[in-house]
Amino acid sequence: MPIQNFAISLDLVNRHYQEPNRNRYESRYFWEQLYPLIATSGFSAIEIPYEPVWQFGGRSGVPFNRYCVNTKYGDAAGYRAALAERGIARVTGITFDPNLFMRNANIDFFFGASGHFAGEALAHAADMGADYFAISPSPYYGRALHYHPDLEAQREAFTARTVSLLSGLAAKAQDLGVALVLRNEYWGLFRGEAILPLLAALPETVKLDVDTASLQIAGVAPADFIAANITRIGCVHLTDTAFVDNDETWKTANPEFPERRATQVFRDPGTGTVDLPGIAAQLASVGYAGPVTLSARQTRDPFRALLRTRALLNQLQN
């Protein structure tokens, strides 16, 4: 696949558990020094997580929401110009995770806050000229279960409210010219193939965001899943892992960091057991022309991860 088909996600900088320390990554200079390194690694396109939390912390250096972008650059156009000056030609996608709002027993709060900020993030995606807006359709299963012990009994009602929220976003996305795609994560209520009934209940404009590592951890072969659902795929995240979830880590409150093992879930692309070259070849063979994003999520060293991802990119182009 040609290099211009690939983007890299800024989730390679872990804002919660590791270096760079908070004083660095909450500063504008850190990101403006990072963009040329991304471009030098061969990427002219990026994906940006949308994280409302940064507008509540007193600083605005993390460019992961509308408030921070407007504070530092005036507006989205100003930020896009700053990216272009540093070798980043476009933002292919914005991602949104509602976990921040699963924080109490009030389910109305969760859906209300998630809907409000997802709508804000979707509008920001349009302002950034993004191709897609990738939303996690549920919070962590274990986090939701902690605040809602009757979650399984309420699954049908939870799903119905999720369909309502996503249907509203789908209509807005269509008006804005942005594709709404559902993230497929191993820790959610709609993990693995459980996302397919949810997708079937939504408008045809809503597509799948295939996360290769999450599928493998959930016990689903990524290649088989892609082959069976190619017509509904709107984005592919090439993520890597060597993690085997043999003790139901997906049901814990923080499934990205297993509480019963000293390990991590994700690996830098090309260092795990997911057949990423095979999946890239499969996508090319079926004529897939949609967004493909490489993610070094949870990496211990973002700068080393850039080099490792570039090494994988060299394989994917051969």
Label the predicted regions.
Residues A125-L151, L176-E185, T293:
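Active-site groove signature of glycoside hydrolases
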Residues T271-S285:
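A short, acidic, amphipathic alpha-helical segment used as a generic capping/interface helix at domain edges
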Residues M1-M128, E156, S164-S167, Q174, ...:
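N-terminal pre-domain/capping segments
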Residues D11-R15, E51, T95-N99, S138-Y140, ...:
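Active-site beta-loop-alpha junctions enriched in small/polar residues
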Residues S44, A89, D131, G234, ...:
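Short acidic/polar active-site loop segments enriched in Thr and Asp
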Residues R143-L166:
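Active-site cleft segment of glycoside hydrolase catalytic domains centered on the general acid/base Glu
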Residues R103-A105, G290-L316:
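C-terminal/domain-terminus segments
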Residues I3-N5, N14-N21, A45-I46, S164-P269, ...:
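Acidic/histidine-rich catalytic cores of soluble enzymes
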